[in-house]
Every structure is written in structure tokens, then in C-alpha cells.
């Protein structure tokens, strides 16, 4: 344990010192680092994909489910998206040093706010090798140093990607310890990292309930997190039929193992006949297992009667729960009870009810006539995301550059003294 603690202490000290140097880093230097990383990944994609295949083979042998394997898998399309995200983040405005709300007060002083970095961010993640790059890019651009701890299932992929990061940071003239990777897979390292409040300013976990529970029980460092992605799509009585079918199908089937996939479909009883038969047929053709309320079960003998547990389950699989409701109020009541406050969407052509839905539904993202799969930092123009927060403090929704900063007050005077 002492050796693990010593390792985390060393990484923490290095990261804290690196964070101090990042405060004065120019936007050009930070952007150059991101562009360098993109180029390194492009040049080394063969070795990255080879490392990823090794991780996939090991994970299949260990019996990882399809959802986790999908998160783990890299291909040329996903690598292209990583590179695209890096370039997009490089092109975003640098939030650090931005001064807002500068106003004269009655005393004659000017008071405003300046945006500053948080300091040192610890990112603990499972199954997603792309997080290695997303997290580094967002932290560097927002002036934060980062300590990465990936899961054992992605150890080869993470190492291949981190090699690209390490070379690129030093080439840009930044402190090499701006981004560090914990090499040991000993789980004690996670516990020590989340307790390292002398060095780490925030922890961002990306993983399952087991990981989040372990972190929450041990952490002395603030956590930016979401527990589940129990997302809902509600088809209103004034929904456009084709929009409803297209949105509901995409929201479930685009990717099953992601937190923005719809897990429960709510349908107004007045549009069941013109929407659900076609939608059910499409789901079944795609291989989606359907579970429904008693009214839904009557529509097809292939639909399994849903249990109380289904409404509060994040499947991360080709499974969907369907419930028929008599009103929007009933739909909102269901969402209030079972939602994880991640993302909800209404399909409706009625302006008043759509506004009511986005006002009354208290999730981190609420949508009108759009698939829940859009709940993503890249799609929101953030250049990517380091995670999605369902908490109400300090940031909510996809966490991009601004979410990795805070504001401090600045006061400008000209010899002012307080009487």
C-alpha cells in the first residue's frame, strides 16, 4: 500500500507543479499540443489499432458483454473522430483569462469575474480508450493538468494513445507532467487518487455503478459524475408520425452501450395505433427485445410484460421498455420517478406542451424533436466531453472546457480605500 500511496503522491506533486506552469501557458502552445496529438495519432493509427485488438481479444476471453466491447473497440472511423475532436477543441476559444461582468460599484471600484482552471483533474475510466484523448485535450485547453487511470481491459490501447500524448506535450513546450498515466492496475491506486485532496482538485469517473460506488465511498476530492443513463423519449399526442418513429428508433438503436441511449419509450395513448405497430416492427427487425406495460403487451405477443425493475434499469443493451400514458402529466410523473436526470426528449408539434416539457423535466439535457443520442459534448459544440454530470453543482450536462473551469472575482481600483 505504501508503494501505491507513494506513487500517487509523486504523480500528484508532479501534476500540481505542472498545473502552475499551465496557468501561464499561451493559447498557441496549448493548441499546438492538441494538433501535435492529432498528428501523432494519425501517424500511429496502425499500432493503436493493433493494441486495441489485443485488448478486445483479452476482453472477449474474459466474457465482457457486447455493450462494453462496443465501448472498448477502436476502428479507423473512431480514430478519425478522435482526431476531428482534437482539432475542434484546438479551434475553440480559450476560456482561461476571460473577464466578464466588470462593473463599477458605488465606491468607484470595478468588480468582475475571471475564468480560471480548476487545477489538477483525476480521470478514472473503464472500457473507453477515447476518453484518454478527450480528457487530455479538454484539460490541457482549459489549463488543467490531468492524471489518468484507465481500466485493465483497455491497458494496451491507453498506453498506445498516451505515448502519442506524451511526445506531443513536450514538442509544444509544455511541462511533460501536464498529463500523466497511472501504469499500475492495482485498484488501490484508485482509492489513493480519490483521497489525494492535497494535490487533486476534482475527480471525474467514467464507468459502471461499482466503480462510482467505490469512488464515492472513499473520495475526499470533489466528484463530477453521473450514475446512470436512464433516458426517456416521450411521443406526444401531437407528434409527427414519421419524426416520432425515426427519433424513437435512432434513440434506442444507434448504439446500445452508451449512456445517452433511450431506455424507456413513453407514448400518448391517442397515437398508439398510428405509431407503435410500425415502430415495434422496426425494433423487432433490429433484434431489440421489447418489454412493456399491460397495454403495450396487447400489441404484440413478442413483447414481454415489464416489471417495476425495468423502469429503473439502464440496459446498455438491445432492450427497450415501452409504456403507454394518457397524458403529458403522466409522462412527466413517470420521468420524475424513474429518470437518472441524464437526458429526456419530447416528440411534438405543439409549442405549448413542448415548452412545458423542457420547463418541468429536471434533467441535465432536455430535447424537443431530437434523438437523445445527441446528448454529447461533441454534438453540443464543446469539441468533446470529459463526462456528463447529472449533479446540479458545479457543472451540469456534458462537461466541456467551461465545465473544467471556475471563476474568481477581480477588483480594479485606483488607490481606493474603504471608509
UniProtKB/Swiss-Prot annotation:
InterPro entries: Ald_DH/histidinol_DH, Ald_DH_C, Ald_DH_N, Aldehyde_DH_dom, G-glutamylP_reductase_CS, Glu-5-SA_DH, GPR_dom. Pathway: Amino-acid biosynthesis; L-proline biosynthesis; L-glutamate 5-semialdehyde from L-glutamate: step 2/2. It catalyses: L-glutamate 5-semialdehyde + phosphate + NADP(+) = L-glutamyl 5-phosphate + NADPH + H(+). This is Gamma-glutamyl phosphate reductase. GO terms for biological process: L-proline biosynthetic process. It is found in: Cytoplasm. It is an enzyme of class 1 (oxidoreductase). GO terms for cellular component: cytoplasm. It comes from Vesicomyosocius okutanii subsp. Calyptogena okutanii (strain HA). GO terms for molecular function: glutamate-5-semialdehyde dehydrogenase activity; NADP binding. Keywords: Amino-acid biosynthesis, Cytoplasm, NADP, Oxidoreductase, Proline biosynthesis. Catalyzes the NADPH-dependent reduction of L-glutamate 5-phosphate into L-glutamate 5-semialdehyde and phosphate. The product spontaneously undergoes cyclization to form 1-pyrroline-5-carboxylate. It comes from the Bacteria. Its main location: cytoplasm. Belongs to the gamma-glutamyl phosphate reductase family. Its EC number is 1.2.1.41. NCBIfam families: PRK00197.1, proA.
